[in-house]
């Protein structure tokens, strides 16, 4: 899984049978994660000098892992990451923002709609404080938080 919310995803995976009533939604698998930086408009400076450098680093991390399918929720940078997975003989699926929902992570975009009303329960969480940039509201009004 490649996402800015890897800490929350890892902590939520152990609750998968409490998040979803149907175990087919989030079945058992070996969870491997790669952290992706948030948008440059809201994130603190990173260890990368450019987005290209960050994507190349993530591709290198992908190449070092033994996986069958990668789930990605990273915006536009998902396209070169999926292409890399395919060139490596793997499968890549870009879920975008809704990737966090698969792991029971709430977001403002879904709070008052059918997802929030029908699926949220006491095991759903918000992204961790460490995954919440100071300027998170600059991304679509903070819809992922």
Give names to the regions the model predicted.
Residues 80-88, 92-145:
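C-terminal functional extensions of proteins
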Residues 23-29, 60-68, 87-91:
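Secondary-structure boundary elements
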Residues 1, 33-34, 58, 92, ...:
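Generic structural hydrophobic/aromatic packing signal, biased to beta-strands
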Residues 4-8, 71-80, 96-100:
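Gly/Ser/Thr-rich loops at beta-strand to alpha-helix junctions
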Residues 33-69:
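A mid-sequence, solvent-exposed acidic-amphipathic segment
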Residues 8, 59-63, 103-104, 143-145:
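Intrinsic structural disorder
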């Amino acid at each position: 899984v490649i996402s800015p919310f890897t800490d929350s995803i890892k902590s939520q995976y152990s609750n998968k049978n409490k998040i979803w009533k149907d175990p087919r939604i989030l079945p058992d698998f070996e969870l491997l994660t790669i952290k992706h930086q948030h948008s440059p408009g809201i994130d603190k400076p990173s260890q990368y000098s450019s987005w290209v450098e960050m994507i190349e680093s993530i591709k290198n991390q992908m190449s070092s892992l033994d996986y069958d399918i990668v789930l990605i929720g990273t915006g536009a940078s998902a396209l070169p990451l999926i292409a890399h997975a395919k060139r490596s003989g793997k499968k890549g699926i870009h879920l975008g923002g809704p990737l966090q929902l698969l792991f029971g992570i709430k977001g403002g975009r879904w709070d008052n709609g059918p997802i929030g009303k029908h699926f949220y329960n006491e095991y759903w969480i918000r992204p961790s404080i460490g995954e919440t940039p100071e300027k998170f509201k600059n991304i679509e009004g903070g819809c992922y938080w």
